[in-house]
Structures are given as structure tokens and as C-alpha cells.
Amino acid sequence: MMASKTPEGSLTNSSQSMSINTLADQVSSSLSFADPSSDGKTGNSKINEQGESGKSSTCRPSTSSDISDESTCSSFSSSINKPHKANDVRWEAIQAVRTKHGGLGLNHFRLLKRLGCGDIGTVHLAELNGTRCYFAMKVMDKTALASRKKLLRAQTEREILQCLDHPFLPTLYSHFETEKFSCLVMEFCPGGDLHTLRQRQPGKRFTEQAAKFYVAEVLLAMEYLHMLGIIYRDLKPENVLVRDDGHVMLSDFDLSLRCTVSLSIVRSANVGSEGLSKNSVSCSQQPACIQQPSCISMAPTSCFGPRFFSSKSKKDKKPKTENGNHQVTPLPELVAEPTGARSMSFVGTHEYLAPEIIKGEGHGSAVDWWTFGIFLYELLFGKTPFKGSGNRATLFNVVGQPLRFPESPVVSFAARDLIRSLLVKEPQHRLAYKRGATEIKQHPFFEGVNWALVRCASPPEIPKPVDLEALNPTPTVPAAASSSVRSDQSNYLEFDFF
């Protein structure tokens, strides 16, 4: 397996440079018109990099004291810095305990249930003592991390979580250390993950309408990550968790890559002009909502009656010009894609690996758009497109076999076209290679989606309430990520021939 190299990504062909955090906050806040309540994981085998990777930070530089300094973390993980969670009572509960006891530790939590086990830690459902506030706590054995050279990966995940403030990304409430463990206190999603939810659907696949809902929310989360210079590298249904309100949240950032990125605003072509791209639709103009506060004062039915797709009456339609084209004022497009990032790491899940990772050619942000295509394919068809008889066969299928669609179920041409545009083996020809999520949002598959109000849409399914108080506490904390819990060890492959 190849060791990773420190990537430096940049976006140099911008017409107007903007502050990363400022613009990311604008896009994130455009989804906060409603404030639905929001409260880990099974997994396929991952391929992990052999060594630790150096990563440039877009949030703040790492220091050696970060591993054990909770006060440093708490200054970043607070409701003040995360407006999407500003009214969350869990912030107040955490702060009350911290103020009363001078800090936060494992003894302040009651571990109720093991939710899942990943490569670097075990996730538990935990209750903050005496508060009825529930969290997902990721517990990592520091000795095991050090022996397996995973300390930097754990640190990178924590730093990424500290940076995030988005409706479809996790909230890190706190981080603390014990003599043996490193713990991340995050929000709990009682709806499980999309993999489990898909298994319960007829035919073990989602309808196209349901799939569109989920991938739209994932796309907005990925767009935000790329704005921050974060390449996710681990998108799959197991890592998309379902909140209690039915909306989703990405999880598991231990394979993510951090790089530098420049944000820019570029002028888009007039939608009524002859030079319009065939894949562009009216929703490409949606970023105007970021700049127009009037969007917030829409009629309540637009948000809470909720419709995912717009349905306009004849009198609501936009006026046409003399030649019959709609009058649409050219509006700026947000471009935030770390196109210059490069890594030689061999990481990911076999069925989701992009060809450039397998071939060891070095990869950048385009790998996320490949996995986005695989993700959509799996939601629609109930399986991934290149799965072979074994892991090795799967990898060779990804590199050498063409994309094929099954005869059943029947999906729309737009859905197949989007998947086909994303699953292009040459990354430079892949949809979203240059302009990221902006290109995908303009694809006809998403025609009619009001991107600013996705958060207000009705989810396809609302999880059944879970009686958390009836759960018995976990007697002991297991040695997270130790060899004793790595039951899928045989599924981990190392490749020295790519």
C-alpha cells in the first residue's frame, strides 16, 4: 500500500476570491430557515493507508498539545461557533457539567449501548448523567492507535469535526482524554444508517424520489466539506446516518484529507441565452438565496407544507421575452473545489474506490464525485455497479469493466445520465471535476429542487421513536479499535503492486 503525501490544493482560475469560512458559513446558513430538531455505524471493509499522512490545515494548525488539551477543544466546539446548534439543550447540559466539575470526563457519562465499531474506534450511545441528553461517543484506545500508527488519523478527524457547522454534518459537543482513551462526544442519530434503511425497503432499494432526497442532502454536505478543503473519501450508505427527523448526516471522517482551497464567485451564463449548457437548468440560479434575505420570508407553506419539488401555477410562471425564452438575470455561481489537491494514499472501501486510487496515480477531490455516483447507483439499484466475486475482482472491475445498468428496476434517463457522468474512469472528464457540486446541482436529475429549502422538505421516512431510557448501561468500555474487535481483519487488503 502506498504511503500518502502532503497535498496542497488550490483553485487559481477564480474571478473573485473570498474568505473560506465566510462563504462556507453563508452557504451553510442558507439551509437554516427551519430549525428541525436533530439528534453509529455498520461498515464494509476499508482499505487504509499504511502510514500516516501529513495534511495541511484549513481550520487551524495542529499542535502536540491538542491530543490531550480539552480546553483547546472546547473553545472550538461551542454553540457560539456553531449557530445551527445554537438552541440545542445539549450544549447547555455539557457546559453545566463542565462548569460544575471543572471539566468533562468519562465518569460523567453512562454508556448504554455499542452502536458500531470502526477502524480507529468504537461508538457508544451515551447519556450525560442526570440530564436525559444522549450522545454518540467515539472511544479510541490511545495505545492501540499508537501501535497501529493511527494517532494522526484520529487527530485529523477531531480537527475536522471541530470545523463543521452544517445541517447535514455532525456536531462535536466535546472531546476529552483519559489515561487510556480518547473520546469524541457527538450527536446521536437514532434512525441508524442508510444501508440498514435500504435493506428494509421493497426490493432492498429506494424509490427514485426517495433516493433524490437523500443524495441532495449528501450533495450539500459534500459541497460544504469541499469549501473547507476537506475531501471526504469515505462516502457509502453505512456512513450516512438518519436523524430522528428523517434527515441525514454524514459520519466517519478518519479517512478524510485536508488541503487548501480557494473559493470564488464566477458569473454564470444567462439561462435564456443560446450558450446555455445542456445540463444547466433553472435551479442553477439558486445560490441567489444566499444573498437575498427575502427568501427567508417565504410563505409558510413553501417550507412546512413541505414540497421537495416546485409546482408552479400558470400565473406564477416567469414572463417570457419576445423570442419565447424566460427572463432570468445572470447570477453568480459559487465555485469551491480543491482541484489542485493530490494524495497517493490508498484508502476507501473496495466497491467505492475510484479508478485513480486503485491505479496509484494520485487523486484529488474528484474521488468524492466518483463515490457520489456509486452511492446514487446503490440507492437506486440495491447494489454497487462493479462488485465482483471478491475484493480483488471488484478492484479490477472498477478499473477495467464498463458501467452497466440492470434491466430492473427502471429508473429515469436523467438518473442514469447523472450516474454515467459521475462514473467516468478518467477524473479530468468526470462531472464536477472543475466546478464541484455546482455542476451536479445543475444536472436535470435535480431539476425543480429548491436547494435553499432542502432542509424543510418532508423526508421519505421518519424513524420510529426509540425508548432510550429503557436501555441498560454498558458494563465496561472496550479497548476501542484493538485487535480483539477487528472481526473483519481478513477483509483488509494491502496492495504493493499498484
Swiss-Prot record:
Top enzyme class: transferase
Disruption outcome: No visible phenotype under normal growth conditions, but the quadruple d6pk, d6pkl1, d6pkl2 and d6pkl3 mutants are deficient in lateral root formation and mildly agravitropic, have fused or single cotyledons and narrow and twisted leaves, form few axillary shoots, exhibits basal shift in root hairs positioning, are almost infertile and impaired in phototropic hypocotyl bending when exposed to lateral white light.
GO function terms (MF aspect): ATP binding; kinase activity; phosphatidic acid binding; phosphatidylinositol phosphate binding; phosphatidylinositol-3,4,5-trisphosphate binding; phosphatidylinositol-3,5-bisphosphate binding; phosphatidylinositol-3-phosphate binding; phosphatidylinositol-4,5-bisphosphate binding
Cellular component aspect of the GO annotation: basal part of cell; basal plasma membrane; cell periphery; plasma membrane
Membrane topology: Peripheral membrane protein
Start-end of Low complexity biased regions: 28-37, 62-80
Pfam families attached to this UniProt entry: Pkinase
InterPro entries in UniProt: Kinase-like_dom_sf (IPR011009), Prot_kinase_dom (IPR000719), Ser/Thr_kinase_AS (IPR008271)
Reactions accelerated catalytically: L-seryl-[protein] + ATP = O-phospho-L-seryl-[protein] + ADP + H(+); L-threonyl-[protein] + ATP = O-phospho-L-threonyl-[protein] + ADP + H(+)
Biased composition (Polar residues): 7-27, 39-61
Active site: 234 (proton acceptor)
Binding annotation for ATP: 115-123, 138
Keywords: ATP-binding, Auxin signaling pathway, Cell membrane, Kinase, Lipid-binding, Membrane, Nucleotide-binding, Serine/threonine-protein kinase, Transferase
Recorded superkingdom: Eukaryota
Compartments it resides in: Cell membrane
Gene Ontology biological process terms in this record: auxin-activated signaling pathway; gravitropism; phototropism; protein phosphorylation; regulation of establishment of cell polarity; root hair initiation
SMART domains: S_TKc
Domain remark from Swiss-Prot or TrEMBL: The activation loop within the kinase domain is the target of phosphorylation.
Protein purpose: Protein kinase that regulates the auxin transport activity of PIN auxin efflux facilitators by direct phosphorylation. D6PK-mediated PIN phosphorylation promotes auxin transport in the hypocotyl and this is a prerequisite for PHOT1-dependent hypocotyl bending. Phosphorylates PIN1, PIN2, PIN3, PIN4 and PIN7 in vitro and PIN1 in vivo. Phosphorylates PIN proteins (e.g. PIN1 and PIN2), especially when NPY proteins (e.g.
Quaternary structure (record): Interacts (via C-terminal PIF domain) with PDPK1. Component of a complex made of PINs (e.g. PIN1 and PIN2), MAB4/MELs (e.g. NPY1/MAB4 and NPY5/MEL1) and AGC kinases (e.g. D6PK and PID) at the plasma membrane. Binds directly to NPY5/MEL1.
Family according to the record: Belongs to the protein kinase superfamily. AGC Ser/Thr protein kinase family.
Name of this protein: Serine/threonine-protein kinase D6PK
Name of the gene encoding the protein in the UniProt record: D6PK
